[in-house]
Amino acid sequence: MIRIALTGAIGSGKSFISNLFGFPVFDADKSVANIYKKNKKIYLKLKNKLPKYFHKFPISKKELIRAILENKKNIKIISSIIHPAVRKDLKNFLRKYKKSKAVVLDIPLYLENKLNKKKDI
């Protein structure tokens, strides 16, 4: 299977372009949103590490923004909890579409998270 990775800033057209290929698309932003809405284990980990900011499930963007704005170091803590869950979603996606000719990986932080060693294009 060919893996086509798209990365870029917010509003750069990744989602639009990824759908033009006609292959299954892994959208990391949707994965993250789904994790915040449905993954109680992630909520509990965040609440354990940052109890000042996380008070109810599902996780709200307001709580996330407050945690990040009040202390920039919190982004590393949040990322260390969220990114493994997104990687798990990505692995499940790749397993599901392993017989597909190609897949598109719409991942804004693709290079920053050093996932670029696992793509074809």
Locate the predicted segments by residue.
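Short coil/loop residues immediately preceding or within conserved phosphate-binding loops
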Residues: 1
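Hydrophobic anchor at the beta1->P-loop junction of P-loop NTPases
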Residues: 4-6
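The conserved Walker
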Residues: 10
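Conserved lysine of the Walker
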Residues: 14
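Post-Walker A alpha-helix
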Residues: 17-18
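Post-Walker A helix-loop "phosphate-sensing" segment adjacent to the P-loop in P-loop NTPases
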Residues: 22-30, 40-41
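ATP-dependent small-molecule kinase phosphotransfer cores
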Residues: 33-99
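ATP-dependent NMP and nucleoside kinases share a basic, alpha-helical "lid"
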Residues: 89-97, 102-121
